[in-house]
């Protein structure tokens, strides 16, 4: 009997080709688009990765591939695990990564649960990453063949159970190869551009979204320098992130950067570019992937944001729930709320949330 796989289809070329490749490999493929946006009438719903146009594109591709297609409602799961988390983190002066939360709790936890209930063996997506089972029996995410599109950073906190039921068919392909496959088989979305912004904030106005979503009003406070001197007034901490230079509204006669955000005093610390570099960081909410736990100090490569190339570091457990990461060379803009993702060669070792 054929193995059944549910493919999360966003209406883009990557998930469309993923569905095609799995069908070619002999799987019984079902296409599913996750309906996550709260208001179908919004512009975001029309253009987002799981909105109205995504449903239309995905349904059209499923028809071309001759596979069953469904839309599943995950609005509540998305609201609780992604939007509410995003808003709460910004209000605490942190900079969250909603895509990581969406992957763990919506695209995998919720979609996998629903898929297993309808008799599927696996779920699959169009992420540029690969899954390997190691000699120790554990599953890990590995870098895709194309570093430019590698998406392992956003998948570091998947569980072993989730990985054992996951297929990532385009991890062995480059983006150009994926588009070439789509063109060759006549998929209508072959030339569709990649989505770049957060799907529920297409205008990138995070502060505006938080205000519209919750009615929260930013409370102005003081800009202070690294010595604690007041040097100006800010618009509210939700407008800033560590490392930020633009939009500060400060005339100091030299470049100024956000060094830290202090929600307890409603202060934003400003300094020179050199002040933004840190030799170490701490992380919690840990998830280990290629190893069950960190028993002793070890070397790794650490990435502190999606676009970070990664830097060599030494890691150890600081306490039962906190990891200490010391970099060989200071890294720029260590940002609370973002993920630290650790690599052992091409394999994801694990990661956590920067504190």
Language model segments and positions:
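ATP-dependent adenylation/nucleotidyltransferase module used to activate substrates
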Residues: 1-156, 167, 176-177
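AMP-forming adenylation/ATP pyrophosphatase catalytic core
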Residues: 124-133, 140-355
